[in-house]
């Protein structure tokens, strides 16, 4: 409403609502330069909003003021790259050189990286990166994803007093936790549920609940031979909407799991 009152016009829609990219672009263009424009975005947008802007003088990268979503800069001879997922760098021969801090704004050219706005100290980063959404080889602010998941499993095993025949993880992100649990508990790790990869990567992303249920059923295939008559610990981090959790419990019993 504030932008409309100033005479700005919205020409794009996304899923029947205001296009987020256009809204952010208008908030930036409402100020005199990119830095104050991005600061305007930080002030007006309540959620997390990290940005990459392609300008005539290079790329401007900005991490949201809370640091919830990562922005990582990598370098190789003669070029820079910016990504929210550092696992994209190694196979392209880039080396990570800088984790952009919360609220920090930098300008990148082929030859240099210039800080336009310093980072703030407060950073309630989203822990979901390490638990679920991050790629195992990635590191966010110096903490490796797979190591974090493995350590989570170790801690769970140390606090858990149940007896089980083996531990399994719901793939993919539950696998690292299951491996850590197996190490901490001293029991085998088995692949009692395997993911059928040519489906949706995330079962919580479809907007329709019936589609989410269908994807959940298609996505994971239990191994009856391993489950039958066994006491099994399952490490399942996929609890965004609970779609996988409710299905998995009933399926495990249907396939013969004892406990």
How should each PLM-predicted stretch be described?
Residues 1, 167, 174-181, 185, ...:
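Extended, hydrophobic alpha-helical segments in both membrane/secreted and soluble proteins
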Residues 2-101, 107-164, 170:
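Conserved short alpha-helical segments that host acidic/polar catalytic motifs at enzyme active sites
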Residues 55, 228, 236:
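A cytosolic small-molecule/anion-sensing beta-strand core signal
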Residues 68-69, 89-90, 114, 174-178, ...:
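Flexible loop/turn segments at secondary-structure boundaries
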Residues 186-233, 242-246:
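Short, glycine/charge-rich flexible loops or terminal/linker lids adjacent to PRPP-binding catalytic cores
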């Amino acid at each position: 409403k504030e932008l409309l009152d100033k005479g700005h016009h919205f020409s794009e829609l996304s899923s029947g609502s205001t296009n987020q990219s256009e809204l952010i672009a208008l908030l930036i263009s409402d100020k005199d330069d990119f830095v104050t424009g991005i600061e305007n975005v930080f002030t007006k947008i309540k959620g997390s909003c990290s940005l990459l802007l392609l300008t005539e003088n290079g790329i401007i990268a900005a991490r949201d003021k809370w640091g919830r979503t990562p922005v990582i800069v990598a370098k190789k001879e003669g070029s820079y790259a910016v990504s929210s997922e550092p696992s994209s760098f190694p196979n392209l021969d880039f080396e990570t050189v800088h984790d952009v801090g919360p609220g920090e704004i930098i300008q990148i050219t082929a030859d240099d990286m210039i800080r336009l706005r310093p980072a703030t100290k407060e950073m309630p980063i989203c822990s979901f990166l390490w638990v679920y959404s991050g790629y195992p080889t990635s590191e966010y602010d110096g903490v490796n994803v797979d190591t974090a998941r493995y350590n989570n499993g170790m801690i769970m095993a140390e606090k858990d007093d149940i007896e089980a025949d083996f531990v399994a993880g719901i793939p993919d992100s539950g696998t690292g936790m299951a491996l850590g649990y197996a190490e901490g508990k001293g029991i085998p790790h088995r692949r009692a549920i395997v993911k059928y990869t040519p489906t949706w990567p995330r079962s919580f992303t479809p907007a329709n609940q019936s589609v989410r249920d269908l994807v959940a059923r298609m996505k994971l295939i239990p191994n009856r031979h391993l489950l039958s008559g066994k006491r099994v610990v399952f490490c399942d981090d996929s609890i965004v909407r609970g779609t996988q959790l409710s299905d998995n419990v009933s399926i495990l019993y249907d396939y013969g799991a004892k406990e």
